[in-house]
Amino acid sequence: SKMKKAVHFGAGNIGRGFIGEILSKNGFDIHFVDTNKSIIDELNNRHSYEIGIASSEHEKISVKAVSGINNSENPEAVIEAIAKADILTTAIGPNVLPYIAELIAKGLQKRKEEKVQSPLDIIACENMIGGSEFLEEKVSDYLSESDKLYLSKFIGFPNAAVDRIVPAQKHKDV
């Protein structure tokens, strides 16, 4: 069976440690997208990484079938990966979401051009309420009406339950 493909924006600790582990457990091949050259190079050299478990000194989880794409150096490869993805996730910080919207839009346009009929869920795993909806708005800014029609048929933006993703933080009411 061919591995399901995930594209994940943000190769930081949450991306690799939490989301990477979940995707890997669920049988996904993971393309990490980040501008951090050293992390991306490392992922491409080793195609796996280890996560230490907080509760145990010895136990480590190994995450395999990973690769990295540097989106500032190689945006075309990101577009290509999105065109073939079965899931797209982010853990880059709410403020950075608008900066990846155009690249995601181009990936969706490529899916449409290639007549990809399989559904794609795009999930913003960010410390914000309604992160995926927010990302959908930003992505839509770059789409034509016919792109949006394609999006409404095949692309989902389910909101993630944020409290499971990052430790609860106390917010003062503004």
Where are these regions (language model features)?
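Substrate/ligand-engaging "lid" and interaction regions
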Residues: 3-7, 13-174
